[in-house]
């Protein structure tokens, strides 16, 4: 029962769109109505409001981190296995991608996945974030940074954690993230992908 409650709570937490919340707080247009239409930090940044984008980034990453850390704590206290952590990680990620509060039309999960990785292991999260930053500095393309980080995240997880269940979980999250970036992949191939800080 505790596991079911944890999974459901993680999904509801993931369903909170901080892009929409931040836009409301800073009196900005709904992030689904401009730019890429994606309720995420990169799209909010297109308004020029860096603080709103930062709130979105921290909120979306934070919910992923909280879900995993709470699952790890309960797992230790109750003697539960990695399955609980994996389930919470997937639930919060799916909540972000398919939020019940936004008619199941959510973001692409980049910040939330970063929070999940940080929750699983600090160095794992840092390594994935550094990958994103390096690619972003070179290319100035957010989606390319996210895609390369997603491709490498399962490998980082395997070598750092040495846990099959969590590696598979991160692999699933990476696959879902990549699938959410299909339009970005098409734009990258066509050389039309928008660069960071510019309107689409």
From Swiss-Prot:
Keywords: Cell inner membrane, Cell membrane, Lipid biosynthesis, Lipid metabolism, Membrane, Phospholipid biosynthesis, Phospholipid metabolism, Transferase, Transmembrane, Transmembrane helix. Its EC number is 2.3.1.275. It is found in: Cell inner membrane. It catalyses: an acyl phosphate + sn-glycerol 3-phosphate = a 1-acyl-sn-glycero-3-phosphate + phosphate. GO terms for molecular function: acyl-phosphate glycerol-3-phosphate acyltransferase activity. The gene is plsY. Belongs to the PlsY family. Signal peptide: none annotated. It is an enzyme of class 2 (transferase). The chain crosses the membrane at residues 1-21, 51-71, 84-104, 116-136, 159-179. InterPro entries: G3P_acylTferase_PlsY. Pathway: Lipid metabolism; phospholipid metabolism. Probably interacts with PlsX. SMART domains: G3P_acyltransf. This is Glycerol-3-phosphate acyltransferase. It comes from the Bacteria. GO terms for cellular component: plasma membrane. GO terms for biological process: phospholipid biosynthetic process. It is a multi-pass membrane protein. Catalyzes the transfer of an acyl group from acyl-phosphate (acyl-PO(4)) to glycerol-3-phosphate (G3P) to form lysophosphatidic acid (LPA). This enzyme utilizes acyl-phosphate as fatty acyl donor, but not acyl-CoA or acyl-ACP. Pfam families: G3P_acyltransf (PF02660).
């Amino acid at each position: 029962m505790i596991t079911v409650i944890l999974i459901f709570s993680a999904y509801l937490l993931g369903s909170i769109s901080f892009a929409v919340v931040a836009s409301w707080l800073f009196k900005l247009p709904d992030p689904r109505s401009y730019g890429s239409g994606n309720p995420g930090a990169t799209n909010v940044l297109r308004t020029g409001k860096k603080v709103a984008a930062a709130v979105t980034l921290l909120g979306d990453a934070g919910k992923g981190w909280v879900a995993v850390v709470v699952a790890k704590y309960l797992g230790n206290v109750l003697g539960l296995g990695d399955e609980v952590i994996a389930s919470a990680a997937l639930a919060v990620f799916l909540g972000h991608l398919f939020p019940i509060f936004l008619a199941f039309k959510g973001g692409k999960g980049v910040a939330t996945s970063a929070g999940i990785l940080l929750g699983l292991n600090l160095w794992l999260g840092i390594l994935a974030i550094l990958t994103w930053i390096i690619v972003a500095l070179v290319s100035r393309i957010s989606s390319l940074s996210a895609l390369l980080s997603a491709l490498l995240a399962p490998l980082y997880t395997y070598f750092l954690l040495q846990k099959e269940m969590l590696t598979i979980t991160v692999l699933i999250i990476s696959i879902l993230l990549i699938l959410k970036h299909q339009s970005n992949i098409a734009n990258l191939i066509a050389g039309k992908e928008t660069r960071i800080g510019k309107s689409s």
